[in-house]
Structure formats: C-alpha cells, structure tokens
C-alpha cells in the first residue's frame, strides 16, 4: 500500500526511434543520447502505445546499456486502443470517461478526458516509470498526454528525455514559419472532405502566417500528396519530410508550382510529415 508520505517515483517520457515500421533501422545511438539510454535501461515499469514496440526498443537499448531486469520481468501496460486512435484530450474522448476505474473520491478528472491515474500506481508506490509511444516523443502528436496529465494531478514528477520528435525536425528543416505553427493530426480519408480540409488549412496559413503540419499513415502518403498538389494554390509553400533520421531521409520544401514542374520524388512509403505555409 502506498503512503501519501512515501517518496513517489518519477514519470520519464522516453522517446523512441522514428524507424517504426521501416525496412531499415537506425543505430539507436544515432538518435538517442547515452543519458536517455541509461534512464530507459533503469526502468522496469512502463505505460506505452504498443507493448510489442516497447519491448523491441528495450531490446535495442539493452544492446547498448544493460537493462536493470530482463524484459520478461518488466511491467508494460498499453493505453486503451481508443486513446491512440482518437486522442486522449478533451472532446476526442467523450465517452471514455466511463472506462475510468478510480473511485469518485479521488482527485477529479474533467468529463471527456481519459482517466490514466490507475496506470501510475507503480509511481505512487515509489517506482520510476517510463512512457513510450511507437515512434518519437510520447504525448506530442502521439498518445500519452492523459498519462502526463494524470502524473501532474497525482504529484508525480514528469521528466522529458532528449530524443527525436518528427514534427520539430520537419518544421526546423522546412523553412516554414517556426514562430507560429500548428499540428492538426490526420486529414480526412474521404477525397472530397480531404480536399476541403486542405483548402481550409491553406486559407488559415495565408490569413495568419501560421504553418500547418499534418501526417498520414504511410500507405496513404501518395494519395495525400496527390491531393495536396491538386488542391493547393500554385504559390503555396508545401513541405514533405520523409523518413526522418533514416539514411534515406529527405526534406523538400517548394512552392506547389515547383513541385509540379520538378516531379518531386520522395520515399512516400516511409513515415512523412507534411507542411503547408506561405
């Protein structure tokens, strides 16, 4: 039983390599500094997007820094699938509140937000914990914000570790406005709705100067790229960052008219970040 006066563990936000689902893997020491690897190797309690991916990353970590315990002895808990498919923020999670398992006498959680406090019991018992998504920094364009929010509510220290974040790498290399930008997630898959959304984002970028960043499932990248070229104005600046941190990484940022004229070739089967700006 944990005590209100017992030292609490910390929640470490552990970045994962960006090569999830790719044919070739980057050496983990190329993308994660030793300090991050050392912390990851010390942890035995995890909350994650995908347990299989987390175990695979831990195996790679263990090849560099010995793990504190065999992977089979680690406690690895996945976030509910609804959280990673719909997000764990206000609005996206209407209805998920009913799945919360803590009693109403605990600190309140606003309606419509997934209650992740039960996942942090190990930290309340004094154990350090890790949060990991399938690729990149958890809770940024990935699941995990509900866990971080719960940690703050419970008085658990949150420690972000250094590692890759695809959105920031893409933005930095794009030439788009890095002082005012938004990540808008996935665009609609329906062709008509997708084109409408693309034009809305373009209008917002033109009106405010705010860069608009978004992603897509790799097998839909080619369709999205075609829709962007067909829907955007010729003068709009369009960026695609493909396979970031991989040997085949490319970041190309041009006006739409120039993309059309040069027939930009990209590794669109790799994870991509797309950007629209002025």
Go through the PLM ranges and name each one.
Residues 2-86, 97:
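Glycine-rich, flexible N-terminal cofactor/catalytic loop recognition
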Residues 18-20, 52, 134-138, 218-220, ...:
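Short glycine-rich anion-binding loops that position phosphate/pyrophosphate groups of nucleotides
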Residues 35-37, 62-64, 146-148, 227-233, ...:
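Short, solvent-exposed amphipathic alpha-helical segments in soluble enzyme
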Residues 141-204:
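Class I SAM-dependent methyltransferase SAM-binding "motif I" and its flanking Rossmann-like core
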Residues 47-49, 130-135, 211-216:
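Acidic beta-strand-to-loop metal/phosphate-binding motif
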Residues 78-141, 145, 150-153:
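Glycine/small-residue-rich loop that forms an oxyanion/phosphate-binding "nest" at active or ligand-binding sites
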Residues 40-46, 156-159, 211-212:
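Short active-site oxyanion
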Residues 2, 8-12, 75, 124-128, ...:
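A contiguous loop/helix-start segment that scaffolds small-molecule binding in enzyme catalytic cores
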């Amino acid at each position: 039983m944990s005590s209100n006066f017992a030292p609490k563990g910390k929640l470490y936000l552990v970045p994962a390599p960006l090569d999830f689902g790719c044919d070739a893997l980057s050496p983990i020491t190329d993308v994660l500094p030793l300090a991050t690897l050392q912390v990851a190797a010390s942890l035995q309690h995890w909350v994650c997007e995908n347990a299989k991916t987390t175990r695979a990353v831990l195996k790679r970590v263990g090849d560099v820094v010995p793990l504190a315990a065999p992977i089979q002895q680690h406690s690895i808990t996945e976030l509910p699938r609804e959280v990673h498919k719909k997000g764990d923020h206000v609005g996206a999670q209407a209805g998920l509140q009913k799945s919360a398992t803590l009693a109403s006498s605990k600190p309140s959680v606003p309606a419509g937000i997934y209650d992740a406090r039960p996942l942090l019991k190990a930290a309340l018992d004094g154990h350090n914990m890790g949060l990991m998504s399938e690729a990149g920094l958890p809770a940024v364009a990935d699941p995990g914000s509900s866990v971080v929010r719960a940690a703050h509510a419970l008085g658990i220290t949150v420690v972000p570790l250094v590692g890759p974040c695809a959105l920031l790498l893409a933005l930095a290399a794009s030439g788009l406005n890095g002082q005012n930008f938004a990540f808008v997630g996935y665009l609609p898959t329906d062709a008509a709705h997708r084109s409408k959304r693309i034009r809305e984002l373009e209008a917002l970028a033109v009106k405010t100067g705010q860069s608009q960043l978004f992603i897509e499932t790799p097998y839909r990248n080619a369709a999205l790229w075609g829709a962007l070229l067909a829907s955007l104005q010729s003068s709009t600046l369009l960026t695609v960052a493909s396979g970031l941190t991989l040997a085949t990484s490319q970041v190309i940022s041009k006006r739409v008219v120039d993309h059309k004229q040069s027939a930009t070739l990209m590794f669109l089967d790799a994870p991509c970040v797309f950007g629209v700006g002025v």
